Amino acid sequence: MTTDRAPRVAMLSVHTSPLDQPGTGDAGGMNVYVLELAHALAARGARVEVFTRATRSDVPETVVLDGVDAAGRALTADDARDVLLAHDVPPGVTPPVLVHHVPAGPFEALDKNDLPGVLCGMAAGVLRSEAARRPGWYDVVHSHYWLSGQVGAIAAQRWEVPLVHTAHTLAKVKNASLGPGDSAEPSVRVVGEEQVVADADALVASTPVEARELVELYGADPARVHVVEPGVDLERFRPGGPGARDEARRRLGLPTDRPVVLFAGRVQPLKAPDVLVQAVGVLRASGRPVPLLVVLGGPSGRPTAVRELRALAVTLGVDDDVVVRPPAPRDELVSWYRAADLVAMPSRSESFGLVAVEAQASGTPVLAADVGGLRTVVEDDVSGRLVPGHDPQVWAEVIADALADAPRRARWAAGARQVAERYAWTTAADQVLKVYAVAAEPR
């Protein structure tokens, strides 16, 4: 990789587009990660092109995002094209990020277990894109999730450039943390991950926990594993002023006279929203104050997941205490965090936990399962609580204790913002650029 200019990056996100709405289907924290990292790298002069599988026939072949000239004005289409094709990015210019929708398989969303069958088509589409450029155009391939890693290994070998891989989640970790009704990850994924770990010139882990899992469970060379903590948009996600909570609740149609606990994420066994519904049931049965539980998310995996969660609430007699809303756009999400007294994450596995960081940046304490990356991003009794296990009785006690102690919640809220301020995309981008440079060195 040349060192006299910022790199040209082929970023792969095969199974989900960074433009998709997080919180339903396969869209989640990884979508946010890819998009935010791409923008942060572009702000440092890198030219980033994201390749994702086209799931509809009516999506544009290429979407051009942002791009700013030296005076801070948005680039015109012609200027954006000139910047993308130039040898060097002019000083003060932020190049646009491109998102390419690659036809591979049917124009529809596919279950992740069916996606290995379209990887050859995806690889061919990525290689065709490079063929339209000058030879040696890309400097590095950065793949996200194991499916992208399979395509990335082919592209990196063909272009003779380094492969950097971010797993986001790992099958062996998930299979050790299955919840009721959850399905084990197939062996094809386990083998695929092992191949990518062996092929990659550098592996990016979000936390020291994930780095250790890559080494201990997948035999990764510790020298090739780099911990780069993701960032959070600290301008978008920040505490409101006096009265912000009630204002957010009125805007969102939530009561102002009742505690609110928020779950934001996909409705699936891995995220365990059922634990929170059962915890509300425990509180209702015990006669203690019961918060309103807001589940902000859509189904992932089973289309019936939301209906099943509502049915559980009815069975437990807490259907009036549980509200399910669809995923919120990014600009609206901060209002949901501000509206909540607590954000709860009873996940059975999390490689990082972006929701926890966003909530803390918004000044909202987090109750998180004591698992994976959540142990890193939530500081126990500083920005919330780390809750052992997934027993609804335990979660009910922790929720009740937190809601009954307003001074402690106020202390947590202040600590939450301080914890979140450690996570900045600018820092993450700088560290990833260093990883790209290291990956280009001979092994």
Curated annotation (Swiss-Prot):
GO biological process: mycothiol biosynthetic process
Glycosyltransferase is among the record's keywords: yes
Residues that bind UDP-N-acetyl-alpha-D-glucosamine: Q21, P22, G29, R266, K271, E350, E358
E.C. number(s) listed in UniProt: 2.4.1.250
Residues the entry annotates as binding Mg(2+): Y337, R338, A340, T364
Keywords: Glycosyltransferase, Magnesium, Metal-binding, Transferase
Keyword field contains Magnesium: yes
InterPro entries: Glyco_trans_1 (IPR001296), Glyco_trans_4-like_N (IPR028098), Glycosyltransferase_grp1 (IPR050194), Mycothiol_biosynthesis_MshA (IPR017814)
Cross-referenced SUPFAM superfamilies: UDP-Glycosyltransferase/glycogen phosphorylase (SSF53756)
Enzyme class: transferase
Pfam family, one: Glycos_transf_1
Gene Ontology molecular-function annotations: acetylglucosaminyltransferase activity; D-inositol-3-phosphate glycosyltransferase activity; magnesium ion binding
Signal sequence, renumbered to the chain: none
Disulfide bonds: none
Record: residues binding 1D-myo-inositol 3-phosphate: H15, D26, A27, G28, G29, M30, N31, K112, Y145, T169, R189
Catalysed reactions, as listed in the record: 1D-myo-inositol 3-phosphate + UDP-N-acetyl-alpha-D-glucosamine = 1D-myo-inositol 2-acetamido-2-deoxy-alpha-D-glucopyranoside 3-phosphate + UDP + H(+)
Quaternary structure (record): Homodimer.
Similarity annotation: Belongs to the glycosyltransferase group 1 family. MshA subfamily.
Described function: Catalyzes the transfer of a N-acetyl-glucosamine moiety to 1D-myo-inositol 3-phosphate to produce 1D-myo-inositol 2-acetamido-2-deoxy-glucopyranoside 3-phosphate in the mycothiol biosynthesis pathway.
Stored PANTHER family: SULFOQUINOVOSYL TRANSFERASE SQD2
Record-given protein name: D-inositol 3-phosphate glycosyltransferase
Organism: Cellulomonas flavigena (strain ATCC 482 / DSM 20109 / BCRC 11376 / JCM 18109 / NBRC 3775 / NCIMB 8073 / NRS 134)
